């Protein structure tokens, strides 16, 4: 019987120059595998706890030596000799060792790193691709990417309020074709920005971060880039937004669009979105209202839920209990899936299955602090999420995921790319 022989951890760097956890596993058959945990810039209040050292003398307090120590001691001892092939059991043990709802003892960056590394080691031990090990024979769907090509909000130092302006390549038959179109649009966008005298430096996720006059100008420029690249807005390339409204709201529930000099209540924000959706080929809005504004979310879903995808990120934080409440109250119609928000592979899978059973769309997602780890690419295919957010066609930590998806598409002879049928049009 194959069993877990050793677990180790190391403090490594993420794409923003901050430390993060690398967990490594060795099995008794000699298999070795590792995983690197990502980290977010804008985070939901109900996310699982990312354990940081708080020592201002090291990495400005952001070190993860405590999380690494928890892996090397408590976690390694409890998982020593356990079969790696029962992921649910592994993750239940991790939950039991921690003893809290949000991994505040061990740190979700410790538990997720171990959970991912064991899943990867198990797949390698069985000589299976990770997507096949986690998803079985039904893992066939290549996700439609949501590519963040203009950054604002907390992901960039500029005057744009919304955090992400994304393109979704819908009108294509393969993932490879969709990625090519996206890359071409990205290069046209760069040329347009440069020609207009804007800076073409990029944000955390590879998108450009120009100083633009309002929150609509990025959409106008993106549409120009789509057309210059020879593609049709909406039919082939649609627009998606991540507003990250929890970063815009004050203690009185008012939303501050500083770039436009506006202060709006929930109804005002909803009217603002209705105007945008009527005016532009927008198919998805993420975190359109604050994570605490459930009454506003209910109204937003009533107004726009039959027209576009309304994604809960900070709203649901990949947590099945919160998602269940949202389903019961008819809040949103899609969920962003970030494994580090919940702390283990199994709990992530549970949230996806709950969403899919209730016809909520799922978007597998990276974080702004990423690495060369490609786990989420396989995970998206394994769970047939149908959509993925993993940045622009720039920055190698983003490209790594796209290249892995290209590889997977070649491996699966009957792979499906469902961009054309993803949304009602």
From Swiss-Prot:
InterPro entries: Enolase, Enolase-like_C_sf, Enolase-like_N, Enolase_C, Enolase_CS, Enolase_N. Its EC number is 4.2.1.11. Signal peptide: none annotated. The active site is at residues 205, 338. GO terms for biological process: glycolytic process. SUPFAM superfamilies: Enolase C-terminal domain-like (SSF51604), Enolase N-terminal domain-like (SSF54826). It holds the Pfam family Enolase_C. (2R)-2-phosphoglycerate binds at residues 163, 338, 367-368, 389. Belongs to the enolase family. Catalyzes the reversible conversion of 2-phosphoglycerate (2-PG) into phosphoenolpyruvate (PEP). It is essential for the degradation of carbohydrates via glycolysis. This is Enolase. It comes from Helicobacter hepaticus (strain ATCC 51449 / 3B1). The gene is eno.
């Amino acid at each position: 019987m194959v069993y877990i022989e050793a677990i180790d951890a190391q403090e490594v760097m993420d794409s923003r120059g901050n430390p993060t956890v690398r967990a490594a596993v060795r099995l008794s058959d000699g298999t070795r595998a590792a995983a690197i945990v990502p980290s977010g810039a804008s985070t939901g209040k109900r996310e699982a706890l990312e354990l940081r050292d708080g020592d201002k003398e090291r990495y400005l307090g952001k070190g993860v030596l405590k999380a690494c120590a928890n892996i090397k001691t408590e976690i390694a001892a409890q998982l020593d000799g356990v079969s790696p092939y029962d992921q649910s059991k592994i993750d239940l043990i991790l939950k039991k060792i921690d003893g809290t709802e949000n991994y505040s003892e061990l740190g979700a960056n410790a538990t997720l790193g171990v959970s991912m590394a064991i899943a990867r080691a198990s797949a390698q031990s069985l000589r299976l691709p990770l997507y096949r090990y986690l998803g079985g024979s039904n893992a066939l769907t290549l996700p439609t990417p949501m590519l963040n090509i203009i950054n604002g909000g907390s992901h960039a130092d500029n005057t744009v309020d919304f955090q992400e302006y994304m393109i979704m390549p819908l009108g294509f038959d393969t993932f490879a074709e969709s990625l090519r179109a996206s890359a071409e649009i990205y290069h046209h966008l760069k040329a347009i920005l440069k020609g207009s005298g804007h800076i073409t430096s990029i944000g955390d996720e590879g998108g450009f971060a120009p100083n633009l006059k309002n929150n609509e100008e990025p959409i106008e420029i993106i549409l120009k880039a789509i057309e210059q690249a020879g593609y049709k807005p909406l039919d082939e390339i649609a627009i998606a937004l991540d507003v990250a409204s929890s970063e815009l709201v004050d203690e009185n529930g008012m939303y501050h669009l500083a770039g436009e000099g506006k202060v709006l209540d929930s109804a005002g924000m909803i009217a603002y979105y209705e105007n945008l959706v009527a005016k532009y080929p927008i198919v998805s809005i993420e975190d359109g209202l604050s994570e605490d504004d459930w009454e506003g979310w209910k109204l937003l879903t009533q107004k726009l839920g039959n027209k576009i995808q309304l994604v809960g990120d900070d709203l649901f934080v990949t947590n099945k209990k919160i998602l269940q409440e949202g389903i019961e109250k008819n809040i949103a119609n899609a969920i962003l899936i970030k494994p580090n928000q919940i702390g283990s592979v199994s709990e992530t899978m549970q949230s996806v299955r709950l969403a899919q059973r209730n016809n909520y769309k799922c978007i597998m997602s990276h974080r702004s602090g990423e690495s060369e780890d490609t786990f989420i690419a396989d995970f998206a295919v394994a769970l047939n999420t149908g959509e993925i957010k993993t940045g622009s066609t720039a920055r190698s930590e983003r490209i790594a995921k796209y290249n892995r998806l290209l590889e997977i598409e070649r491996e699966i002879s009957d792979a499906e790319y469902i961009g054309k049928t993803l949304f009602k049009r």
